[in-house]
Amino acid sequence: MFIYCPSEKPKAGRQVKEQPPVICIDERNGIFVTPKDSHGPRVPVHVKKQVVSGSIACESPLCRDFMRIGVESGNPGIECDHLQRTNRAVCYSAPAALREDSLQSMVDRGLLSKTRQDECVQLRKKSIAGGVDCVFPIFWHEHTSVRLVYFSVFTGVKDNWCQFERTRVSFDSHLGKWHCQCRNRMRSCVHRYLSMWWLFQEKPHLLSCQTNPNAEDSDLDERVIDVAETEVATLASTDIQELTGFVNKRTPNSRLL
């Protein structure tokens, strides 16, 4: 079991610079979520950090390239900004568990089919067997968007889009549109219905706008991610160049592959 908690409070009178939040969402496997970018829209990204096993990873391709270059340059301990934040993470706190009676209410109201209901129940059971939360809503406290709601959803599989068996789902409460980073782009996926299940059960007022898990062609999250990742790509390119220059100075005989 692995939990990060802040060990010290800021001393009185000390001006503390606000840092991007980071939340532990899976203490068993050392999974955290934190904003992709230090500024702007707080689109979450998953990271994994287990001290005992030495397993550290970030799902951002830019960060993976950054750390790969570090390893190839003889600096295997280098971490991206997202991973460094885990040292001050908010401790794990279990979200409200999904209840099957609320899912049945969704079926009764015609919000999803019996087939989708069965898919949701089966994936929920699989997450319980693995000792992890099926749906973890991501709220950045006072910085939480009143429009976009994000979820970390269990997938039960590992792939390029869910390296830690979790995917990111977003819901635009103004437009009633959903988005999931999984591969099922042309049709609604079970991950969106699981997120809707949690909202229907815990925050039904956010579903007041007519919602359709299949509708995502104008999803705001897509535009937010495009802007954020463009900015991060520029920063990452600069960071990699600086890292390469630093490593070459320290280890002139090393060669980047």
Task: Enumerate the predicted regions with their spans.
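Long, low-complexity, compositionally biased intrinsically disordered regions
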Residues: 1-257
